A protein has these predicted regions:
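Mature extracellular or lumenal effector domains of secreted proteins
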Residues: 1-151
Length: 151
């Protein structure tokens, strides 16, 4: 699949999140038609922004992304100064020591080397079964991100 859309698709039902009795939400990253990474969250009692937090994780493609895991960032908002959304990061320690699982890079910023990409957005993910050092540039680049809601 190519990145041919000029905008993102967002179902209008998201605006009525609290009226839908949502049980689970799955965020998945795809390369072509192949799912390459995912996080499933318990969404009972959640809002459209707080379903994506570490304490709600019930399943993940990374073995160490769990509700009991330790992260310095795990949120939709992410790391604002570097425009990293849907960011799951294990540890910051200056660019050469940053280790994480996934990030959506919105646009070019003066951040780390791994924040610079040829096109935006970028859907980045660790290709190993745990957090990876972002500066190794071994992360995968998904073609798209999808969010599935289970009622």
């Amino acid at each position: 699949m190519e990145r041919s859309l000029s905008s993102h698709y967002r179902d209008p039902g998201v605006d009525n999140w609290s009226n839908h009795n949502i049980k689970y939400v799955k965020l998945a990253l795809y390369e072509g038609r192949r799912e390459v990474a995912y996080v499933v969250s318990n969404a009972v009692g959640s809002s459209m922004t707080d379903w994506f937090q570490s304490t709600r994780v019930i399943a993940s493609s990374w073995s160490d992304v769990t509700a009991r895991g330790t992260y310095n960032v795990f949120s939709i908002t992410g790391y604002l100064s570097h425009l990293r959304r849907f960011y799951i990061n294990k540890s910051h320690g200056g660019c050469p020591k940053d280790r994480g699982y996934m990030a959506v890079s919105d646009s070019k910023v003066q951040g780390c080397q791994w924040d610079s990409h040829p096109i935006y957005p970028q859907f980045l993910y660790s290709k190993i079964n745990s957090a990876d050092n972002w500066e190794r540039f071994m992360f995968g680049r998904a073609d798209f991100l999808a969010i599935f809601v289970y009622i």
